[in-house]
């Protein structure tokens, strides 16, 4: 049934910042404690509803496969918990990567909202994590990654599973930045056919086809109350929907969001952009992610493999897309590069 949320009627959007989680990918998980503290404080003062903090691949994502971080999840979370006054401290967990024990530890630090993330066809593995998070009294969202890879009706059935486990919100998560506005609309309309009106909908956009803001606007018009975004778009690939840009566009439409756009602009330019060792933007490599429908966090791994083996990053990414590789298969990027090198030398 249709979502209870109506942005055009003045209902307030729920702005979820992901600068300190998805943004970890953009800096290879190397945020310092002072960085996360200052960014979180600025976001809190600017009025965002929630701030997500974790390794880019969620709690306990630090590994040889995903990459190690400058600090532990607990150090980052504790630093942010110390400075928040209004925003809800949020984290992300992937069943099979993060355990329920880590979820409990995050709760003890002050996390009160969690997104339980699975590949778009694997909602069934989220049942335990969603259930325990609800038992802890947390706000819980289901996060269906790579939502472009299956048809809207199939995605909606996965969303329905997450709802049945206790998720209070279910996201269309465009991890590859491969959806356009029609694709977002079709998926949220499919959600309407199976989800309860009181179950919130969310959108997590990536900007690989430069559609992050447009997709988020369409999602809100289709009943999505929760909007993921990050300062300067700080995130995997070409980044997420840039928060300050989305809020400016929402202001132009007269939507209710509760954020100060000027403060967000300042935080983006003064605190976040200087940290980018690789510009977060649409360029030939990040565009290839959206074009091929590849998991956005593969970017830095593919660039490293291309440099090591003398290949073009784009050809690696396109081949990963052809093979339909998904999040968690980062170790296969080197295998693909070696296969391509053999073909060149044959």
Curated annotation (Swiss-Prot):
Source lineage: Bacteria, Pseudomonadati, Pseudomonadota, Alphaproteobacteria, Sphingomonadales
Keyword Electron transport set for record: no
Protein name: 4-hydroxy-2-oxovalerate aldolase 1
Keyword Nucleotide-binding applies: no
Active site per UniProt: 25
Location of the Pyruvate carboxyltransferase domain: 13-265
NCBIfam families xrefs: 4OH_2_O_val_ald (TIGR03217), PRK08195.1 (NF006049)
Positions annotated to bind Mn(2+): 22, 204, 206
Reaction catalysed by this enzyme: (S)-4-hydroxy-2-oxopentanoate = acetaldehyde + pyruvate
């Amino acid at each position: 049934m249709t979502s209870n949320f109506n942005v055009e009627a003045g209902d307030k959007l729920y702005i979820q910042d992901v600068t300190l989680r998805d943004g970890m990918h953009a800096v290879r998980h190397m945020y310092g404690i002072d960085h996360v503290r200052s960014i979180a404080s600025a976001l809190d003062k600017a009025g965002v509803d929630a701030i997500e903090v974790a390794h880019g691949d969620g709690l306990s994502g630090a590994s040889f496969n995903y990459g190690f971080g400058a600090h532990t999840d607990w150090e980052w979370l504790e630093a942010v918990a110390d400075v928040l006054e209004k925003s809800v401290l949020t984290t992300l967990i992937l069943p099979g990567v993060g355990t329920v024990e880590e979820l409990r530890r995050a709760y003890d630090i002050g996390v009160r909202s969690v997104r339980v993330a699975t590949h778009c066809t694997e909602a069934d593995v989220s049942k335990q994590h969603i259930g325990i998070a609800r038992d802890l009294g947390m706000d819980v969202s289901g996060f269906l990654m790579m939502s472009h890879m299956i048809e809207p009706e199939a995605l909606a059935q996965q969303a329905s599973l997450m709802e049945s486990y206790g998720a209070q919100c279910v996201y269309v998560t465009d991890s590859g930045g491969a959806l356009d506005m029609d694709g977002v609309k079709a998926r949220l309309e499919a959600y309407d056919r199976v989800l309860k009106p009181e179950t919130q909908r969310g959108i997590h956009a990536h900007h690989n086809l430069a559609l992050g803001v447009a997709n988020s606007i369409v999602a809100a018009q289709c009943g999505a109350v929760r909007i993921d975004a990050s300062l300067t778009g700080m995130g995997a690939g070409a980044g997420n929907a840039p928060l300050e840009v989305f809020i400016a566009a929402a202001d132009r439409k007269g939507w209710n969001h509760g954020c100060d756009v000027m403060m967000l602009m300042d935080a983006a330019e003064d605190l976040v952009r200087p940290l980018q060792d690789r510009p977060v933007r649409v360029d030939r490599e990040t565009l290839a992610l959206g074009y091929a429908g590849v998991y956005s966090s593969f970017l830095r791994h593919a660039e490293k493999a291309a440099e090591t083996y003398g290949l073009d990053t784009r050809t690696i990414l396109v081949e990963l897309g052809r093979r339909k590789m998904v999040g968690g298969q980062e170790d296969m990027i080197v295998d693909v590069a070696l296969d391509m090198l053999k073909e060149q030398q044959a």
